[in-house]
Amino acid sequence: RHQSDWLAVISLDLETYVASVVGAEMPSRWHREALKAQAVAARSYALAHLARPATTSYHLGDTTRWQVFSGETSTTTASRAATLETRGMILSYGGGIVESLYASNDQVSAEAHGHLGASMSQTGAQQLASQGLPFNAILGRYYRGASLARLKRYDQ
């Protein structure tokens, strides 16, 4: 129970979670590189919240307050591919995992996260991908100073 209501909490594999978030946060018809940038941002955000859970009951919610998560209903072929192609990749800064904030567009990104200095615009990522930028360059535009890293459990 959470306060006076029952609360369902799901525990699942990170990559399954990321594929659902990508499918819920971006249209599947968007450029593959934008979807890959979203996958890395979503994975990094989720892992950053393992260290700082939303509540004592769960790490992340499933709404735009955190990341939209709809389970299998939002997972698409495109979101699975973007997740697989970036499997285990995160954003790192100073040896830690970046809480890679993002929002739907530049204005919302600036209003919601501008004081933090690093937040990806999803429509901006789509525009950059359409101009030919790969996902790592897109992430570099929004998360200055951060670098791509691979989680040790994915190293082979």
Question: Which stretches of residues belong to each language-model region?
Answer:
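Conserved, single-site charged/polar hotspot
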Residues: R1-Q156
